[in-house]
Amino acid sequence: MARVTKKLDAASFQLKDQVVSINRVTKVVKGGKNMSFAALVVVGDPSAAVVGFGSGKAKEVPQAIRKGIESSKKNLMRINLTQTTVPHTVLGRFGSGMVLLKPAPEGTGVIAGGAVRAVMTSAGVQNVLTKSIGTNNPHNVIKATFDALAQLRDRADVAAARGKQVEDL
């Protein structure tokens, strides 16, 4: 299960946004069809290993993206990284989607598709192997990715949980 983290202030980071998906939604009403747009956005600061996601809905695409950026800034989390990769293999789940993250050696790059790639690059991960299993719905894939990222623990966390020094591991 994901750990509860303290709120991070978006103003203290240099966040870059990346639009993952834009979906046109039509609501059929008595007088015709009402068109609107839904945007899924990921923001992150690669140098600080901070990333967040959010969605926005509006009648126009730019307003939907703006709302998605505002929503994602309220949803930031810090990620434990080992140099440029994830510290260990982890499996994140949400709905019928699963995302597997595996550490990779230097020079591998981000081997990921679509929504997972957007999250990894925004978080500052430079070398990682990923596999998306199950659904390819970007909302569920991103939530599964964030579940996996929340499970990451570095050596200091493991040592503290075991009541040992980092050198003893």
Each model region followed by its residue ranges:
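Ribosome-associated RNA-binding proteins
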Residues: 1-169
